[in-house]
């Protein structure tokens, strides 16, 4: 048996039992090479529909297709070996009916071999979450700020900053948890509300702009590496790779123009007879 095949990949139940335990570490990845790096340090990798913004330059995640998610999901699965890989269900692939959601989720699971899917929406998606969970598809929920709903929200603004608006968000979390989600992402929600939700539901919460009290945290990899031109308030930059990459490219361009690259060590001599 090879070393790689002996490594056990984390599963949705592994994350589920981390409620009130060691915080869950999660990042996004869309490529095999970044997945290999993330895999060494994270419990889970999200192949997020944020790839629409990060990889393709879309203003929102709305244009992202199922085929795009499957393609990058396959890449991340090939690059990783230990972390649970969760693939986002993109806008338009699951909202029509629970049957539509099932067909889309089956494609994702079969074609990428990932361990779970994620979908946005609260109480209105509870029936769908239950339908998928009962049929062997682990579902990660996503409440609070739901980027796929940008056209009805109007802007990417934090949710629940007035206590009068807490009840619907609390109901969303409760409904998704009771429907069978193994964990729930809470995005851009007022800290006291995120803390309250975490304390009141039985499944792990994973915060992004929520609370340190959540059972885990997730960020977009490119945001925390300093590769994104703009980052949300909730991002802490653990690197500043943008300028470093640009400096390397500029150095390459200088060497090509001056014929300093390639050097003798980079070219092939004739074989000696």
Curated annotation (Swiss-Prot):
GO terms for molecular function: 3-methyl-2-oxobutanoate hydroxymethyltransferase activity; magnesium ion binding. One of its GO terms (cellular component) is cytoplasm. The keyword Metal-binding applies. Catalyzes the reversible reaction in which hydroxymethyl group from 5,10-methylenetetrahydrofolate is transferred onto alpha-ketoisovalerate to form ketopantoate. InterPro entries: Pantoate_hydroxy_MeTrfase, Pyrv/PenolPyrv_kinase-like_dom, Pyrv_kinase-like_dom_sf. Binds 1 Mg(2+) ion per subunit. Mg(2+) binds at residues 49, 88, 120. It is found in: Cytoplasm. It is an enzyme of class 2 (transferase). This is 3-methyl-2-oxobutanoate hydroxymethyltransferase 3. Keywords: Cytoplasm, Magnesium, Metal-binding, Pantothenate biosynthesis, Transferase. Its main location: cytoplasm. SUPFAM superfamilies: Phosphoenolpyruvate/pyruvate domain. 3-methyl-2-oxobutanoate binds at residues 49-50, 88, 118. Its EC number is 2.1.2.11. It comes from the Bacteria. One of its GO terms (biological process) is pantothenate biosynthetic process. It comes from Bradyrhizobium diazoefficiens (strain JCM 10833 / BCRC 13528 / IAM 13628 / NBRC 14792 / USDA 110). Pathway: Cofactor biosynthesis; (R)-pantothenate biosynthesis; (R)-pantoate from 3-methyl-2-oxobutanoate: step 1/2. Belongs to the PanB family. HAMAP family: PanB. Its cofactor is Mg(2+).
